[in-house]
Regions:
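C-terminal-of-GTPase-core extension/linker across diverse P-loop GTPases
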Residues: 2-7, 27, 126, 130-202, ...
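Switch II of P-loop NTPase G domains
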Residues: 20-24, 47-63, 227, 246-269, ...
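Conserved catalytic network of the ASCE P-loop NTPase/AAA+ motor domain
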Residues: 66-68, 89, 232-236, 241, ...
């Protein structure tokens, strides 16, 4: 396990609580990538330092810690510019990563199919291109001077050309596979399509396995699923298609959103979305907003959607003593019943609370799915609505 330290900043927009939540998530990402976190550093900043992201005093404090504890990798919670990465690398003299780089590394580890590997490689190349100059710092002393004019720059330009060519080849390869996958989706006929979406590690694959009695890879790690899995599911006598998709995350690199276009096409072309939410997470509402932001970016936010609150078997409200009249009651003190009332008042029958692990309320979910899929199917094929009763 690589010894790592994490670095985050506290700003006016990103207060202490939110910053610590992001860093907890970064620690989970680090563990998923095979690292172990020895310490977390934070600094209050109005604006990141354009040269080193954090201030000089904090830089010196971290540098001493790195030396004393033989730290191999430093990971920043925000994306670093090429200049910042280069400057920090010189000061710390160890591997420097940011959240984007870390996510790309996890995706590279998790990619199993040729298509997923191609998508990840494209995202990595797009991330790498503006950072090539920093990788040639060992040639900086050769720049300029008599007889030493520009060998470093020549190497950089050569590398840039290689990476640009690689990007072009990968894009063409993805286009070809996209066409093929579009044809495959077309060949599935007119069956209603349901896509399971949600934040990473909320239990989408576990739910997919339960509904379809199939074996989609599910694990308590971030991004356990990269490749979209499509299954035919029959509830009552109504057949439809259901797909499990890659999990979303806050600060998801734009390169990945672009690269995983075809994976997201499963969401774009779906008739109904099952938005799975981990109700046990203290910031599940923010996770919901992050997913909806990406759905909006791919023009899928207004699709018919069922909100599926998962992991109710593990939900625990923060308790307050009955005679405590000082502590302010907030959402973290809500009981499960209070959350149910809150969301059902807002969204009515489009909400359900389940436990995929304990199979709790799964029959109710199936009935709700049947009702929604039947509604779409009957609209599409009004002449055969008699085949599918309103209630199963």
């Amino acid at each position: 396990m690589e010894k790592t330290v994490l670095i985050g900043i506290i700003t006016h927009e990103q207060g202490l609580e939110k910053s610590m939540d992001y860093l907890d998530e970064l620690a989970f990402l680090t563990m998923t990538a095979g690292g172990t976190v020895t310490k977390t550093f934070t600094q209050k900043l109005n604006n990141p330092n354009p040269k080193t992201f954090i201030g000089e005093g904090k830089i010196n404090e971290i540098r001493e810690y790195i030396k004393e504890n033989n730290i191999q990798t430093v990971i920043f919670d925000d994306e670093l510019s090429a200049t910042q990465e280069r400057n920090i690398s010189k000061i710390f003299n160890c591997k420097i990563l940011d959240r984007t780089n870390l996510i790309l590394d996890i995706f590279a580890q998790r990619a199993k199919t040729s298509y997923a590997k191609t998508q990840v490689e494209l995202a990595q190349c797009q991330y790498l291109l503006p950072r090539l100059k920093g990788m040639w710092t060992h040639l900086e002393r050769q720049k300029g001077g008599i007889g030493m004019r520009g060998p470093g720059e020549t190497e950089i330009e050569t590398d840039r050309r290689i990476v640009r060519n690689k990007i072009s080849l990968l894009k063409n390869k993805i286009k070809a596979i996209d066409k093929q996958m579009h044809v495959q989706r077309g060949n599935r006929g007119k069956l209603v399509r349901v896509a399971i979406v949600g934040y990473t590690n909320v239990g989408k694959s576990t739910l997919m396995n339960l509904l379809c009695k199939s074996k989609v890879f599910a694990e308590d790690k971030l991004f356990a699923t990269l490749d979209t899995t499509v299954r035919k599911l029959v509830i009552g006598n109504l057949p439809f298609l259901i797909s499990d998709t890659v999990g979303f995350i806050r600060k998801l690199p734009t390169q990945l959103v672009e690269s995983f276009k075809s994976t997201l096409d499963e969401v774009r072309e779906a008739d109904l979305l099952l938005h799975v939410i981990d109700i046990t997470h203290s910031n599940f509402e923010e996770h919901k907003q992050s997913v909806e932001k990406i759905l909006s970016e791919i023009k899928s936010l207004n699709k018919p959607t069922l909100l599926v609150f998962n992991k109710i078997d593990n939900y625990q409200a923060v308790e307050i003593e009955a005679d405590d009249l000082i502590t302010e009651r907030t959402k973290k003190h809500y009981t499960l019943d209070q959350w149910k009332k809150t969301w059902m008042n807002e969204l009515g029958e489009n909400v359900i609370f389940i436990s995929a692990k304990d199979k709790k309320n799964i029959d109710d979910l199936k009935e709700l799915m049947y009702s929604k899929v039947r509604e779409i199917h009957v609209t599409r094929f009004p002449y055969n609505n008699f085949l599918y009763p309103e209630i199963i």
